[in-house]
Amino acid sequence: WERIQDAEQIVKKAQNLTDYFLDKYQDVERIGLTGQMHGIVYIDKNGKCVSPLYTWQDERGNLYSENGDSCGEKENAYDEIGEEKINEVKIKKTKGISLIEEIQQKCKLKTASGYGLVTHIYNMRHSLIPKSATSFCTIMDYLGMCLTGRQVPLVHVSNAASFGFFNGRKMCFETEKLNEMGIEEKWLPEICTDVKKLGTYRNCTVTAAIGDNQASFLGSVGNKSNTLLVNMGTGGQISILSDWYFEKDGIEARPFLNRKYLLAGASLCGGKAYALLENFFRKFVKEATGQDKPLYKIMETMAEKGKEFDARQLENRRLKIETTFDGTRVSPELGGSITNLFSDNFTPESFTYGVLEGMSRELYNMYQTIHNGTDIEVKHITGSGNGLRKNKVLCEIVEEMFGAELVLAEHEEEAAVGAAISGSISNVNTCKNC
């Protein structure tokens, strides 16, 4: 249920690429950083990583134990965590709920499995935190430490908020609520609201990492208002710039730059839904013919035919596929569904189109939540991610559903562009602990 990666290998490859580009382009002055949000690595007092990367896909916060208790709960709340003991917090047994549900009930906070502090709570309760660990940060924060020789992490608010237990209005961690869950403030990394200078690497200024959602928005939309960024990768995501803080079920107000927010909604399956369908078709073809080849080109043709067929149907005769195959952040137990299935639409063409339409509709419903709560109107749509770049029919569906023209982002690696921009506009004053 945990989703882990080799943090040292990731950083080694990133540093090798950095060296390659610095050798090739001699005029580089600044290095901006970004990477996957939510996940964490543990750091020791010398600034060295002492754990794998626990990614955003970690599902342990949704687990229940066999005896019906919260799976985040220890039988003995005073088990040793490294060399220390939890000696001030008495954790009550809670019957039949997951750690996520326990947090919601006890702290009145909505968070999600895979968020860094949820992972940390689970690890703490199961004695999984390395004895030498003193704090944690994102993988890109750790890269910044390795490049500059920092011994303590500095986390931009765009990443700090992705850990959960974060007050986006006050731009600080919810320390009292963390205490209720047994987390001491000493674990929390230092945070910054501006993109601060971390230090230098090969005479280049290295700046604090920003979240990949914020970097993608900055690299494709910039600071434009009324422009919706639709990203379709493994997951799906919408983001739009706001001067005001707004949150509701499924919508987060993520700290951006210049005290603004990105109102964001994310689907857990997204482009993965289309990949699941391709794998389904591919398995059948392999059994029938012995051939095992990608079928995306064929599926594109089928999607076009399915779209044409769907346009001729009455609304109550149109195939509807809910692509929540991995649940949602609000309802992780939710599954997908197929409705309005009739003999004339029980076809590969309708299923292919139906999955694409379902992927888009899940994001559109999130936008409706934003619009109803803020009156923000979408006038332009910027598309990013291979799910859109490689699927003309999906682009057409998004345009028709959202009622605006979709323009693909100029640069394919939008987050990398955004990271570079963040480095160029950052406050070069070094943070106090650099």
Language-model-detected regions and their locations in the chain:
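Active-site core segments that coordinate phosphate-bearing ligands/cofactors
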Residues: 62, 71-110, 117-152, 164-175, ...
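N-terminal phosphate-binding loop and adjacent alpha-helix
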Residues: 1-27, 64-68
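A conserved helix-loop-beta module that forms one wall/lid of the active-site cleft
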Residues: 178-196
